[in-house]
Curated annotation (Swiss-Prot):
Functional description taken from the UniProt entry: Catalyzes the cleavage of the N-glycosidic bond of deoxyribonucleoside 5'-monophosphates to yield deoxyribose 5-phosphate and a purine or pyrimidine base.
Organism classification: Archaea, Thermoproteota, Thermoprotei, Thermofilales, Thermofilaceae
Residues noted as binding substrate in the record, renumbered to the chain: 37, 82, 106-108
Keywords: Glycosidase, Hydrolase, Nucleotide metabolism
Highest taxon of source: Archaea
Annotated catalysed reactions: a pyrimidine 2'-deoxyribonucleoside 5'-phosphate + H2O = a pyrimidine nucleobase + 2-deoxy-D-ribose 5-phosphate; a purine 2'-deoxyribonucleoside 5'-phosphate + H2O = a purine nucleobase + 2-deoxy-D-ribose 5-phosphate
One Gene Ontology biological process: deoxyribonucleoside monophosphate catabolic process
The EC number(s) this enzyme carries: 3.2.2.-
Record protein name field: Putative 2'-deoxynucleoside 5'-phosphate N-hydrolase 1
Subunit details: Monomer and homodimer.
Cited Gene3D superfamilies: 3.40.50.450
EC supergroup of this enzyme: hydrolase
Record GO terms (molecular function): 5-hydroxymethyl-dUMP N-hydrolase activity
Family of the protein in this entry: Belongs to the 2'-deoxynucleoside 5'-phosphate N-hydrolase 1 family.
Length: 143
């Protein structure tokens, strides 16, 4: 199964350590993570990619992915776009937010009631991984 892991890139990257652990956990479980770059310390644009190249690559990866896992504890226009893009294609989205940041997550995201969307609060990354284990497509909770 191909996972699009989404996380803030240009804004507040306070959850980066959690994103790195999520990436590692997904790969250890045999998932193909298409967006390993979200866990990089150096941004793609700092490596020379143009915004257009980033957009085109990410759209291609969104189309290829089976499920989107988004870290939404800190605001990101890009992650919001990716979530909407995926949802409108009827694909499953799991949004993860640190419990202490849940009220800071966009009301638009917190208000999604579509069947292919789950917002999951977590206290630490181990809890997030445990919840992901039960929620990824194929499990009872996302069907």
């Amino acid at each position: 199964m191909k996972v699009y892991l989404a996380a803030p890139m240009r804004g507040d990257r306070s959850a980066l350590a959690n994103v790195k652990k999520l990436l590692q956990a997904l790969e250890e479980r045999g998932y193909v993570v298409l967006t390993k770059h979200v866990a990089d310390d150096v941004l793609d644009v700092e490596k020379g990619m143009t915004p257009r190249e980033v957009f085109e690559r990410d759209i291609r990866l969104l189309e290829e992915a089976d499920v989107l896992v988004a870290e939404v504890s800190y605001p990101s226009l890009g992650v919001g776009f990716e979530i909407a893009y995926f949802l409108l294609r009827g694909k499953p989205v799991i949004a993860l937010a640190l419990r202490e940041r849940l009220e800071s997550v966009s009301a638009m995201i917190r208000g999604i009631t579509w069947e292919n969307f789950r917002l999951v609060a977590y206290s630490d990354v181990d809890e997030a991984i445990e919840k992901l284990d039960s929620m990824l497509p194929g499990s009872v909770d996302m069907q």
